[in-house]
Each structure stands twice: as C-alpha cells, then as structure tokens.
C-alpha cells in the first residue's frame, strides 16, 4: 500500500471501521486503531463518546471535511424544516464532491475533491472547482471533455464494489450525471451504519 493510500485509510484505522467498503482497507485485517498503542482494549464509550464517534464517522466519509465546514452544514440542516438528521444527510449528499464520487467518475471521495480542484468538472456547462459546491435538483454534472480519458476516470467506472444510487442518473458513455432528488438516510448506500441523529445530539448538548 502506498503512502498516499495509507493516509486515506487512516480514518478507517482511527474509527476501526471500513467506512467506504474498500477491499484494501486495513481494518479488514485487524480490529484496532492506528499507532503503537492501537491494540489496547477499548473501554465502553460514554454517551458523549458515542455521539463524537458518529460525528467523526460522518465527517470522515466525506473526506474528513473541516469541523468549521461540517458544523456550518449542521446549522443549515437545523434551520430547515423537517428532521435535522435527514436534512444533514441531504446537504452532505448534495455536495459536488459527493456526487462526483457517487457517480463513479473517480474511485474515492478524496480523488473527487482533487478532481474538482483541478478543474475537471462542469456543472450545467460551466467549470466548477469548489468541492463543497451545493447542487440543486436537476443540476447536470459532467466530466470535461479533455478529462474523460484520464486513467483515474476509466478505472473508477469499472469498479464493481459500489453502485450508483438511484437519486443520481449517470451516463458513463458521456460521463454525465444528473442530480435527481435530495436523498434521505435510507436512500444513501453507506458501507457502514451512519447515525445522524447522534450527530444532532452532539451539537445539541
């Protein structure tokens, strides 16, 4: 495993879960966290610890986004009508990097962030290089013409380990995806259990 891959799996090791469902994740082979003290037996988590872990897991899944950005997303979810946890999932899944990853244009969420930063993605015909760009229902995301033959794109399309969720329509021949609707928790194909209700409890303390 390269240093780059190892860094990406640090989140898996820290949480002790294979949060992206990747076959190469080191937690498939061991049940302890990173570092020399990782093998120590972990005690039962407090309520705060359980809530914190739920937050870390959700943050980690979307590329370990910053606390400032994650809290801002939570606060927006809390201001909206309806269930705050469901709103939070909908907002996270409407991020451009999440949709590029879900559409299988790239193999990982980290690759999606870099891919967008490097200017390989259009939204509604215009180049967007902001990872956290919020998509609206009906928005069309496309890999730019000059980028469609990049090895990382061709590799990602062939990945069998995950499917494109039904709230995104994808044409892999044209490398175009349409964001059809805002998903709820039950719609999102997470590889592990996500508990946004515990994230709400964490921020409501």
From Swiss-Prot:
One protein family per Pfam: Ribosomal_S4
GO BP: ribosomal small subunit biogenesis; translation
UniProt keyword Methyltransferase present: no
Alphabetical UniProt keywords: Ribonucleoprotein, Ribosomal protein, RNA-binding, rRNA-binding
A GO cellular-component term linked to this record: small ribosomal subunit
Residue segments, region Disordered: 19-45
Annotated ranges, domain S4 RNA-binding: 94-157
Source species, domain of life: Bacteria
One of the record's GO molecular function terms: structural constituent of ribosome
Coiled coil: none
SMART domains reported in the protein's UniProt record: Ribosomal_S4, S4
UniProt entry tagged with the keyword RNA-binding: yes
PANTHER family documented for this protein: 30S 40S RIBOSOMAL PROTEIN (PTHR11831), SMALL RIBOSOMAL SUBUNIT PROTEIN US4M (PTHR11831:SF4)
Function, as annotated: One of the primary rRNA binding proteins, it binds directly to 16S rRNA where it nucleates assembly of the body of the 30S subunit. With S5 and S12 plays an important role in translational accuracy.
Binding partners and assembly: Part of the 30S ribosomal subunit. Contacts protein S5. The interaction surface between S4 and S5 is involved in control of translational fidelity.
Family statement drawn from the similarity comment of this UniProt entry: Belongs to the universal ribosomal protein uS4 family.
NCBIfam families for the chain: PRK05327.1, rpsD_bact
Protein's name in the database: Small ribosomal subunit protein uS4
Lineage, uppermost ranks: Bacteria, Pseudomonadati, Pseudomonadota, Alphaproteobacteria, Hyphomicrobiales
């Amino acid at each position: 495993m390269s240093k780059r891959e190892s860094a990406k799996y640090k989140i898996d090791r820290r949480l002790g879960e294979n949060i992206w469902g990747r076959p190469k994740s080191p937690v498939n082979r061991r049940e302890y966290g990173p570092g020399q003290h990782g093998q120590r037996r972990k005690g039962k988590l407090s309520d705060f610890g359980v809530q914190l872990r739920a937050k870390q897991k959700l943050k980690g899944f979307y590329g370990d986004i910053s606390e400032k950005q994650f809290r801002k997303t939570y606060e927006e979810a809390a201001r909206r009508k309806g269930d705050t946890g469901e709103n939070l999932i909908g907002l996270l899944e409407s991020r451009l990097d999440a949709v590029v990853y879900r559409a299988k244009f790239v193999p990982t969420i980290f690759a999606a962030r870099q891919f967008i930063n490097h200017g390989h993605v259009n939204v509604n015909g215009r180049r967007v290089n902001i990872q956290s760009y919020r998509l609206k229902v009906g928005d069309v995301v496309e890999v730019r013409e000059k980028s469609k033959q990049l090895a990382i794109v061709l590799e990602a399309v062939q990945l069998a380990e995950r499917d494109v969720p039904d709230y995104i329509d994808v044409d892999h021949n044209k490398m175009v995806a349409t964001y059809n609707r805002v998903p709820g928790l039950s719609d999102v194909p997470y590889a592990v259990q996500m508990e946004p209700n515990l994230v709400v409890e964490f921020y409501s303390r």
